[in-house]
Amino acid sequence: MGFLSKILDGNNKEIKQLGKLADKVIALEEKTAILTDEEIRNKTKQFQTELADIDNVKKQNDYLDKILPEAYALVREGSKRVFNMTPYKVQIMGGIAIHKGDIAEMRTGEGKTLTATMPTYLNALAGRGVHVITVNEYLSSVQSEEMAELYNFLGLTVGLNLNSKTTEEKREAYAQDITYSTNNELGFDYLRDNMVNYSEDRVMRPLHFAIIDEVDSILIDEARTPLIISGEAEKSTSLYTQANVFAKMLKQDEDYKYDEKTKAVHLTEQGADKAERMFKVENLYDVQNVDVISHINTALRAHVTLQRDVDYMVVDGEVLIVDQFTGRTMPGRRFSEGLHQAIEAKEGVQIQNESKTMASITFQNYFRMYNKLAGMTGTAKTEEEEFRNIYNMTVTQIPTNKPVQRNDKSDLIYISQKGKFDAVVEDVVEKHKAGQPVLLGTVAVETSEYISNLLKKRGIRHDVLNAKNHEREAEIVAGAGQKGAVTIATNMAGRGTDIKLGEGVEELGGLAVIGTERHESRRIDDQLRGRSGRQGDKGDSRFYLSLQDELMIRFGSERLQKMMSRLGLDDSTPIESKMVSRAVESAQKRVEGNNFDARKRILEYDEVLRKQREIIYNERNSIIDEEDSSQVVDAMLRSTLQRSINYYINTADDEPEYQPFIDYINDIFLQEGDITEDDIKGKDAEDIFEVVWAKIEAAYQSQKDILEEQMNEFERMILLRSIDSHWTDHIDTMDQLRQGIHLRSYAQQNPLRDYQNEGHELFDIMMQNIEEDTCKFILKSVVQVEDNIEREKTTEFGEAKHVSAEDGKEKVKPKPIVKGDQVGRNDDCPCGSGKKFKNCHGK
């Protein structure tokens, strides 16, 4: 209890401090009320001018803290004049918490949108841009349109960033004081900005301050989903079809084992024997059969662990992922690692080609790049540890403006799902007769349709809100609080939407919320409850459970089943006890703990790629922003030459290999005959460097003389092509390394440490290959002046296609190099490049 008391005391202390500062804002109400509209806008200009004279971000933040009461008072007065709404004290407190870079946890209906206007205005005064982030484009559009009235009144500009906007429109949106956008679009724009060829093609400014609405949904629920920009990879889809046919033949327990708790599925020995016969291979687990076993495992996952209308839907011949937290489909998103193709094979729709990742980032790493990050939501306290550890954000529970009157009733648990759903329908019928509006929450699309059919049989008119008809969301939600309304909704039930009570509903007990199953996350259950009882309204909530629910099957239903059997309870008799609720909450905590651990592991692995991505993007940006790229090229020429001397000449064990060294120099830098063995034999390494460097320098100058003012554009083109080509291959190689790295634990190795070490080695090899290619293309390309090198057009990202540096050539995919394989220096390199080992990964 000591730890819990500390948390509660900490929140109470924070609330008192916020309350005192909010009182200072309210105290300025009369003084602000006498200002004219023009005087308010002049105040904004004054703040902006004073902040523009401060070039240090920390000093700017100190100044913002100083003017906070006056700035917030201006926003309150502006809101009063524009919307005829004055933010309450609790909203001011929430706004202060957000300005501090924390999360304001505010109940549904407490006015988070208006709360955010105060910290948004204050931080936008610095002129560095504020991003207000919502979970979907509909909310971004609505909020930007509504709030622009207030911000324009105060003298600030507002932009809206949508996926459909052109590059110019996006750039203009980001240039405004305040920009509304979705988290997805921000992440993709960041990746695109780091794939352009010219600085003027970028759309974003440096990331300064972000306020995330429904912050738990974006930073927790979506943290494990990376944003990926990809191009198609040429690969046959026939193996998916074969694996699908094979998976359909298999029987559980005989041919494969399935663990419902972990959702892991794998072949038994009998299943492996069948696979060897079906695919005509001697040993399924031989290295050369890795593709076969990978496709079989993926097909098994598609058939056993994923259900249609629960995990995905098929719409117009296309497989669409269903977001497990919102119930919405996610057009454009695809399962990775071939799983989407396996589902397409399972459902008999066209199998689309696999894609090759060109750029990727997780939300965890994207949002940690902001100077300051804050958020608001109705449900965050259960995930406070994760917010603190990963994002350095504290969760502050803001009091409600009016006391909560909702009655949260104990869970009712039934033996079977049939008994549960019968009871749910009876409850709905009873409430409907009285005229009380009912909101039924379901976890899956198929459940919502099942209940809908039961209600139809009883003659109850109702609306269904799920991924299949989400376009009517606003209309359905608007009517959900009216007398006699019955609404069935998946978890999408209104993140960012308010259910307002109709006339006479308060007297009937307000909105009744019925949950038909517990979600694995307590936050999602709390969000469903929170649809009722907004702003002091009456309401009630209750969850109906059964021992056949997925969460109960995965965790602890056996004990309850024995207990219910001893009591002699039948299908129609529920248990209502604190023990049941505690057991369910305990199961949820275990799932949440597992998910947190998984997100932490992802972050640890992603940290390796984050550092590498930072180096590559910085390198690209410096090439784009520098007017003269010759210094970069010069450094690459020198380091590549020095590396070759260290390898061929400075050998501790062997005699210097003069001829192989000359062959390498001729391949990368010079023409045959430019350097002979007589030129370098008997000389030490330093002298050899000087002799060869003089020749390279002359060849480099010769290219400059031919191309003259076009040389810089030529170098930039070669550098960017080389970086992009090798970086794309490197991402693919790192992905392959990561997919199999967990198997190292069976050999008592540390998978994360191995991934870090080998990832570092692969990155070093990639950087060397970039330098080699750049040197070779710049010195060995035959370019005529009349070729008139034109500026390359930046890749069209809308189609997520990327033009390779060597159009028309089929790229050889690098194979992982297994340590311990004895490869001769003159043997072909096992990476598959076609070069000798000593000239490739043997350097």
From Swiss-Prot:
SUPFAM superfamilies: Helical scaffold and wing domains of SecA, P-loop containing nucleoside triphosphate hydrolases, Pre-protein crosslinking domain of SecA. Signal peptide: none annotated. Residues 799-826 are annotated as: Disordered. ATP binds at Q91, G109, E110, G111, K112, T113, D498. It comes from Staphylococcus aureus (strain NCTC 8325 / PS 47). Its EC number is 7.4.2.8. May bind 1 zinc ion per subunit. This is Protein translocase subunit SecA 1. The gene is secA1. Keywords: ATP-binding, Cell membrane, Cytoplasm, Membrane, Metal-binding, Nucleotide-binding, Protein transport, Translocase, Translocation, Transport, Zinc.
